Amino acid sequence: MGLGNLLARGLGIAIGAQVGARVAHRIRPRPYPAPLRHLLDHPARMQYRDPVATLGPFGLGPGQTVLDVGCGAGTFTVEMARQVGGEGRVHAVDIQASMVEAARVRVTAAGLSERVQFHHCGAYRMPLASDSVDLAVLIASLSEMPQPLFALEELRRVLKTGGRIAVSEELPHSGYVPHWAVRNWLREAGFRYGGLRGNPFCYSLLYFNDG
């Protein structure tokens, strides 16, 4: 078999694996595998997922209460904690205990543990007071939930009137959902459109909770 055929075969296998993973995820959404959490900080991903650049359009500021839904290994949690300052608070939520622990270690190493409260739970029912959150951030996590509308209903409960929700998705993630589908979910949940940034490869939606 020639080199060209080998390359074509390898490419076909890779594409087939990607298609299979996406179909399986669409049938049965599931969290990002914890054993692969090191890939969340891979330099290739950081080319388009730099925490400062990703969070910039969401309007974080000193004194805010921010909710990191599906915090994973804390890739964005640390930067959230920096931006809310000493008077702010970050609630980091993940359904996988090992992810919560990895994020806790990371935040502690950054010297920001006093600003972050961790919750090992799902997004359908969170141990947070109603009307207590200024901003909820979901980065490649809403698409991992079997019932995204249940999560959005819970987020409406915990968000303050006038609070914001930022949903961001990226094409390399096997659970990727196009922005028009996420917009339909957010509209159905009662949020008001606030803007779209990025491109089909990696986009962010901002919506408001009008109460």
Predicted segments, located by residue:
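Class I SAM-dependent transferase core
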Residues: 2-61
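Class I SAM-dependent methyltransferase SAM/SAH-binding core
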Residues: 67-69, 73-125
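Helix-to-beta-strand junctions that scaffold the AdoMet/dcAdoMet cofactor pocket
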Residues: 84-85, 145-146, 159-161
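A short acidic, Gly/Pro-enriched loop at the edge of an enzyme's catalytic core
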Residues: 124-135
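A short SAM/SAH-binding and catalytic strip from SAM-dependent methyltransferases
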Residues: 134-146
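A short glycine-rich, Lys/Arg-flanked "PGG" loop and its adjoining helix->strand segment in the class I
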Residues: 149-164
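Conserved class I S-adenosyl-L-methionine
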Residues: 166-189
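Core SAM-dependent methyltransferase catalytic element
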Residues: 189, 198-211
